[in-house]
């Protein structure tokens, strides 16, 4: 069994942040579905602007909204407009892994390429 990349939103743009919320990353539900992210799933975030890497969990955002909002303590690690990578990993048996679901996004969090 191996720990492999399962889902990735590449170049997502932070649309909002809320330090006073209990935590999480709110992601447009349509984007979640495209890369197979589930509510409350653990994700690793890498901020391309400042190099920060941290973990949080996913909550659903309004479908079609383009929302990428960091909440709670994680909100202190990003700024609106930062470009981030959202990654989720899974444990797979040899032979069952077919690669990650990857969506590359533009500055409005619209999908420009699927891998």
Swiss-Prot record:
Cofactor: how and how many bound: Binds 1 pyruvoyl group covalently per subunit.
Reactions catalysed: L-aspartate + H(+) = beta-alanine + CO2
Binding annotation for substrate: 56, 72-74
GO function terms (MF aspect): aspartate 1-decarboxylase activity
Single GO biological process annotation from the record: alanine biosynthetic process
Catalytic machinery residues: 24, 57
Source domain of life: Bacteria
EC number: 4.1.1.11
Keywords tagged on the record: Autocatalytic cleavage, Cytoplasm, Decarboxylase, Lyase, Pantothenate biosynthesis, Pyruvate, Schiff base, Zymogen
Coiled-coil boundaries: none
Signal sequence annotation: none
Enzyme class at the top of the EC tree: lyase
Pathway field: Cofactor biosynthesis; (R)-pantothenate biosynthesis; beta-alanine from L-aspartate: step 1/1
Regions crossing the membrane: none
Main location: cytoplasm
Subunit composition and interactions: Heterooctamer of four alpha and four beta subunits.
Purpose of the protein: Catalyzes the pyruvoyl-dependent decarboxylation of aspartate to produce beta-alanine.
Family, as annotated: Belongs to the PanD family.
Protein name from the UniProt record: Aspartate 1-decarboxylase
């Amino acid at each position: 069994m191996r720990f492999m990349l399962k889902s990735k939103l590449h170049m997502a743009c932070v649309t909002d942040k809320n330090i006073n919320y209990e935590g999480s990353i709110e992601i447009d539900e349509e984007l979640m579905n495209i890369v197979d992210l589930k509510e409350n799933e653990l994700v690793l975030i890498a901020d391309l602007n400042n190099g920060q890497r941290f973990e949080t969990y996913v909550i659903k955002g309004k479908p079609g909204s383009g929302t990428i909002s960091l909440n709670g303590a994680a909100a202190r690690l990003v700024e609106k407009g930062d470009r981030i990578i959202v990654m989720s990993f899974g444990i797979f048996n040899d032979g069952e892994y077919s690669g990650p679901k990857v969506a590359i996004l533009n500055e409005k969090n619209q999908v420009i390429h699927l891998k």
